[in-house]
Every structure is written in structure tokens, then in C-alpha cells.
From Swiss-Prot:
ATP binds at residues 26-33, 144-147, 173, 181-184. The reaction proceeds by a bi uni uni bi ping pong mechanism. Coiled coil: none annotated. Its main location: cytoplasm. This is Pantothenate synthetase. It is an enzyme of class 6 (ligase). One of its GO terms (cellular component) is cytosol. Keywords: ATP-binding, Cytoplasm, Ligase, Nucleotide-binding, Pantothenate biosynthesis.
């Protein structure tokens, strides 16, 4: 595996290839990341991963400074997963001057759910992904569906800017008890880790209610919030949305959406000091 630190060296090295496959990460890799790499490997003639903790997508009170950085373990894991090129720029390389030009996703997608609770998050994500795409120039890019809204934002960006990149979403990998794999799971205490599965279980209960005929989305979401709060969580949202646009479905379209696999349930909640997200397609 070749490790590259500069954009110039990356472009020079990749000039020998025609179909790069790309998996961007922030490091602290787990089996979920490695599953993305394995999916990406046969899709191109060179497999590129990046490690870059992107300051633009963190709010001032969030965990940019404490986000786990596990360089040696990450390099070993990437090599074992078949990565050919690791692009690991420093902040000065990717942002040599203030990033005053930014990608602004539409408010109806970027200012709801995660975007409501993390203002500016999707501007930061879109901007760094656009910049990484410009550096790598992949033919295919692979992302996890755990970050469901992020995947939709990136797909929309690629479509509207006519980027010649196929964006592939890969199903969320889960622990044996159902907890979605996440770098932030490392923050959990043993007691919190045992409790953490209840976020995915809350979404499963919502799905069960929808399949049983529930059409009152507001009441469904409110009850799920109450139930999770009673367990000691601080939920930001537990939401049922249309898969197509992440908007709230009208009561008279819920049944048809459930029947035609047209809904997604999304949740974000804090247990202790750790904020977790998850989703479930219905």
C-alpha cells in the first residue's frame, strides 16, 4: 500500500490508472469501514482510501480534538483489506488557505434531522467530499448507509454537478446485538455499550407499528422519543420519512409507502456523553 500525503503526488501516482475506486474516511477504522473497502475493491483498477478528520464538519463544542486517531492500526487494517493507495493529507495540504468557497446543499435536505441539530454539518461534509473527489477523481465512490442523510446529500451533489462518479451505498454493518458499528462506539462505557442497542430497537419498534397499520407519524415519533428518554437517553430525533426526499409523509400516503418500501426511520440520541445515529429502511 502506497501512502501519499500531497495532492500533487496523489495525482501523479493515479495518472497510471483509469478507474479509481474511492472510500473516504476519517480514520479510527472498524469492520464497517473495511466492508466498504471490500465492496469497492472489484469496482476499479486501483483502490484509494483517504484518512482526514475534517474540521469543517464539526461544531465548536463537538469532538474534533478528541476524535479517535488510530494511525498505525488504520494502516494495518487498510493494507489487509486490499487498499492500494492511502491519501492522508494534513490540514494545511487540503486547506492551505481559508476555505471560503463551500458547497451549500439545499436547505430542505441539509437543514433537517442531522442538519438541524448540527448546523453547517452538511456544508462541511459536501465541501470536503467535493475536494477529495477533485483530488482522487474516482470513477466510483463508496459510502456507508449508516450515514443515510449524508449519502443522500452526496448523491445529490454528484448529480447536480454532473460529476462522472458512481456513488454506491453499502448496508450498515452491525454488532451481534444489532448496534450499528461506529467509530464513536469507542466512547461508550461498558454499561452504555449494553444499553446502546436500544436505539436500533426503537427504530425496529417504530417499523413494527408502521407495518401494523399506524399512520399517525407525529404520534409514533413522540412515543418513541418518550420511551427512549425513559431509559436515560437524550434523543434528538426519531423520525419516519420518505426515502425519496426525507420529508414527512402525509397520513394518506403512509400505508402505500410501507407497502412499497418507501419509508426510512432515522434516529439520533445521546447516551451518556456519546451521540449515536442509526436508520432502518421500511
Amino acid at each position: 500500500m502506497k501512502i501519499v500525503r500531497t495532492i500533487a503526488e496523489l495525482r501523479q501516482h493515479l495518472s497510471a490508472y483509469k478507474h479509481p475506486a474511492f472510500v473516504p474516511t476519517m480514520g479510527n477504522l472498524h469492520e464497517g469501514h473495511l466492508s466498504l473497502l471490500r465492496q469497492a475493491k472489484p469496482l476499479g483498477d486501483v483502490l484509494v482510501a483517504s484518512i482526514f478528520v475534517n474540521r469543517l464538519q464539526f461544531l465548536p463544542h463537538e469532538d474534533f480534538d478528541t476524535y479517535p486517531r488510530t494511525w498505525e492500526a488504520d494502516c494495518q487494517a487498510l493494507q489487509a483489506a486490499g487498499c492500494d493507495v492511502l491519501f492522508a493529507p494534513g490540514e494545511q495540504e487540503l486547506y492551505p488557505e481559508p476555505q471560503t468557497y463551500r458547497v451549500q446543499p439545499p436547505a430542505e435536505l441539509a437543514d433537517i434531522l442531522e442538519g438541524h441539530f448540527r448546523p453547517g454539518f452538511f456544508v462541511g461534509v459536501s465541501t470536503v467530499v467535493m475536494k477529495l473527489f477533485a483530488c482522487v477523481q474516482p470513477r466510483v465512490a463508496v459510502f456507508g448507509q449508516k450515514d443515510y442523510q449524508q449519502l443522500m446529500v452526496i448523491r445529490g451533489m454528484v448529480r447536480q454537478f454532473a460529476l462522472p462518479i458512481a456513488v454506491l451505498g453499502v448496508a450498515t454493518l452491525r454488532a451481534a446485538d444489532g448496534l450499528a458499528l461506529s467509530s464513536r462506539n469507542n466512547y461508550l462505557t461498558p454499561l452504555e455499550r449494553a444499553e446502546a442497542v436500544h436505539l436500533s430497537q426503537s427504530l425496529q419498534q417504530m417499523a413494527k407499528a408502521l407495518r401494523a397499520g399506524t399512520v399517525d407519524i407525529a404520534a409514533l415519533e413522540q412515543q418513541a422519543m418518550v420511551d427512549l428518554t425513559a431509559r436515560g437517553w437524550q434523543p434528538d430525533y426519531l423520525a419516519a420519512r420518505r426515502r425519496a426526499d426525507l420529508q414527512v409523509p402525509a397520513a394518506d400516503e403512509v400505508a402505500a409507502l410501507v407497502q412499497n418500501d418507501g419509508l426510512v426511520l432515522l434516529g439520533a440520541a445521546r447516551i451518556g456523553n456519546t451521540r449515536l445515529i442509526d436508520n432502518l429502511e421500511v
